[in-house]
Amino acid sequence: MNLESIQTFCLQLPQTTEGIKWGNDLCFMLSEKMYCVASLTGPFSCSFKCSDEDFAKLTEIPGIIPAPYMARNKWVNIHESSVLTDEEWEHYIGNSYQLILSKLPKKFQQSL
């Protein structure tokens, strides 16, 4: 999956917004809470939040590491898009979205 495919997938999720942070990172957010971050410059790099179980499983795969500064919150960083299939990318980014959604106020959740 490339940056454009990630962007297309994320923007189809309800109430997703995008913005550029830290100069060159494209952030996908739900109610101002990030759930996926991709680098706009340099080599491919994408990070997303995952469950404790998925974090342990994914970080055992070569090419997937705990995300710098965000690992304590169970974010992973991927530098080679081919380590996951397109279906896996969509599954894990979708799960990241759901994890963020579950932490938002119930009123917001019900509005979706």
Regions found by a protein language model. Name each.
Residues 1-112:
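Charge-dense, helix-prone N-terminal extensions
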